[in-house]
A protein has these predicted regions:
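Glycine-rich phosphate/adenosyl-contacting loop at the front of the ribokinase-like
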Residues: 1-71, 263-272
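Short pre-catalytic strand/loop immediately N-terminal to key active-site residues, enriched for Gly-Thr
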Residues: 21-30, 205, 230-237
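Short, small-residue alpha-helix embedded
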Residues: 37-39, 45, 230-259
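Conserved N-terminal subdomain of the carbohydrate kinase-like
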Residues: 46-126
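Active-site-proximal loop/turn and secondary-structure-junction residues that shape catalytic pockets
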Residues: 128, 158-160, 191
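Catalytic-core regions built around general acid/base machinery
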Residues: 137-148, 173-181
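Short beta-strand/loop segments at the ligand-binding rim of alpha/beta enzyme cores
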Residues: 149-156
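Conserved phosphate/ATP/ADP-binding segment of small-molecule kinases
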Residues: 162-229, 249, 260-263, 267
Length: 272
């Protein structure tokens, strides 16, 4: 079984200094969905990317690189109507050119239910939830994943998504609307700060365990915490990326119905 990720893929032009001060850029594959799929594939898992690229040289280049990295690109869409997005990065600055590009133009009518039936999990993040056809595609994908029994996993990554949103307040409000649609949350301290005004998880747990949410992974600077509604586990932070934790969940063959019954030893096996 495979993991499905919905998001954008863009050509990232990276420089060692601020983009306006450099003459040389290094081209690489950008976008949260692309990055997550590459990390999952590197672990030996099967990761398929749901995204749309322009039917242009940049789009073909990115798709070829993802395929070389072991990502299943069979669900990628290509369009002549919009170009592949480009993002300039450097010196902690991101200048995205994506407002009228292929990634955000991926609409719900382009998604089929069949790929979700053979998937163990569906993963998404916040950058692609900006007001666009892609946000509507996320809603359809969540419904299809839930109908298929796949785990719905949300990685808000609000600090990383903020440069790609016109307003931070709109980003946070949208993230709050999507939290309870997931079965599993992967949170960072910066997520809590932006959503609830505090880095303390205790102040947010009651608000987080609503809707479909059954399992929360919380990444602190030096530790990872795992919570169900009744059990908590903790481990020293090493290299337990969300991709690795999800890979372990797939190996344990955990269906959605098993999440509320996870015990402390099982949580430790996921994060240890």
């Amino acid at each position: 079984m495979s993991v499905l990720c919905l998001g954008e893929v863009w050509l990232e032009l990276n420089a060692a200094m601020a983009p306006e001060l450099t003459e040389t850029f290094r081209a690489q594959t950008g976008g949260w969905g692309a990055g997550f799929c590459r990390r999952y594939a590197a672990l030996g898992g099967q990761a398929a990317l749901l995204a749309q690229l322009g039917a242009d040289p940049f789009g073909r280049k990115l798709a070829a690189q993802l395929a070389r990295d072991g990502v299943d690109c069979s669900l990628l869409c290509f369009t002549d109507a919009f170009p592949t997005p480009v993002v300039f990065t450097g010196a902690d600055t991101a200048l995205p050119y994506r407002a009228h590009t292929a990634g955000l133009a991926l609409g719900p009518e382009q998604l089929e239910a069949a790929p979700f039936r053979g998937s163990s999990a569906f993963c998404f993040s916040s950058a692609g939830l900006v007001d666009s056809p892609l946000r509507l595609a996320h809603l359809k994908a969540l419904a299809a994943a839930r109908d298929a029994g796949a785990l719905c996993c949300y990685l808000p990554r609000l600090a990383q998504a903020a440069p790609y949103w016109p307003q931070r307040e709109a980003l946070c409000q949208t993230a709050l609307q999507f939290l309870d649609r997931a079965d599993v949350l992967f949170l960072e301290e910066s997520d809590l700060l932006l959503l609830f005004g505090s880095r303390e998880l205790r102040t947010a747990l009651f608000a987080l365990f609503t809707g479909h949410v059954q399992l929360i992974f919380f990444y602190k600077k030096d530790r990872i915490l795992a919570f169900t509604r009744s059990v908590m586990a903790s481990a020293a932070k090493k290299d337990q990326s969300p991709a690795l934790v999800l890979y372990r969940m797939e190996k344990m063959m955990l269906p959605v119905s098993a999440l509320p019954r996870l015990n402390k030893s099982e949580l430790n096996a996921l994060i240890g």
